[in-house]
Amino acid sequence: MEFYERVLGFQRAYLVAEREAAFYWIGGPGHSMLGLWGAGAGPQRMSLHVAFSASLEDILDAPKRLEAAGVVSRDFWGEPSKEPVVIGWMPAAAVYFTDPDSHLLEFLAMLPESARPEIGVVTWNQWRGEIERSAAL
């Protein structure tokens, strides 16, 4: 992590020490993101992935567009999914997929709601339900 912070000057967005994971903004908050995990500690057996900033509209449409191109969209845990997930600590909507060389890629859209790290990672529909319940209180 020191390399990315001190040498490259990346801004740390989030640290999950118990999972040996660190996330860095590239180009400032809300833009592209680099996620790093200790060997074998990351979801989907990854040690690195790159997240590209996208609009929420593009994120919501991505599973359908990827499927039409023969690419499987996946959830945070690597399971095939037809809807985005929401990462509560950011919060951001995300869709994961791999390129032809098996590199893990992510489309990411920051959401306007307040961060909810306590919910972890949930499906888009679960997130919308949580937001609606909170608004009703």
Where are these regions (language model features)?
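Core segments of cupin and vicinal oxygen chelate
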Residues: M1-S32
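Residue-level detector of conserved, well-ordered beta-strand and adjacent loop positions
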Residues: W25, W37, T98, L108
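Short glycine-/small-residue motifs
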Residues: M33, L104-F107
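Short, flexible turn/loop "capping" segments at secondary-structure junctions
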Residues: G42-Q44
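Eukaryotic phosphotyrosine signaling hubs
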Residues: M46-V50
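Vicinal oxygen chelate
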Residues: A51-P100, L104, L111-E118, T123-L137
